[in-house]
Amino acid sequence: LAVQRDALLQQRGHAWLLQGPSGLGQFALGLSLVRAWLCDAPTAHGACGQCASCHVIDVHAHTDLCVLMPETQMLALGWPLPEKAQADIDDKKRKPSQEIRVDAMRDAVEFTQRTSGRGKGKAVLVYPAEQMNAITANALLKTLEEPPGDARFVLASEAAHQLLPTIRSRCL
């Protein structure tokens, strides 16, 4: 992962698509990239792992990072759900979603349009990206076509062929 991360950190652009078969560590690589971008004291090889920014990523609480996954996966990996989603699930109004919900994507798009809290820009990590349905993917597409200035996106996928061709074409 370190070699891939170092190579990707040299790239310029606002959207990356990390793809490969299951088990290669796409989420870990995506999170490593995001950590390096948001780190207060990055090294030539990525995030320092010691600063306040790295710490809040470790505890899943960075204000400039939005992680989008199916709710079932977020819960399994210990990532917090948006307040409304958590309230709906707690109140038994619905079960955790098995796909990335369109309202979560719309919230992420709105998130990218706000000012960075720590001055390093905003980052959105989507995993597994193939868990977006067409409506969710289209909610992301406009932002990929006209990205906010300091926002970066990482889409990590085990089945990139299932993504809309227009999504794939907007990513490095």
Question: Model segments located where?
Answer:
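Loop/turn-to-beta-strand initiation segments
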Residues: R118-A123, P148-V154
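Conserved adenine-binding aromatic site and its adjacent loop/helix in ATP-hydrolyzing domains
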Residues: E110, K142, S169
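Conserved catalytic/switch belt of AAA+ P-loop NTPases
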Residues: Q113, N138-R152
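A short helix-turn-beta junction within AAA+ P-loop NTPase domains corresponding to the substrate/partner-engaging
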Residues: T166-L172
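Residues immediately C-terminal
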Residues: Q131-M132, E146, Q162
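Clamp-loader machinery-focused feature within the broader ASCE/P-loop NTPase space
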Residues: L1-I135
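A short beta-strand-to-loop transition that corresponds to the Sensor-1 phosphate-sensing loop
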Residues: Y127-A129, L155-A160
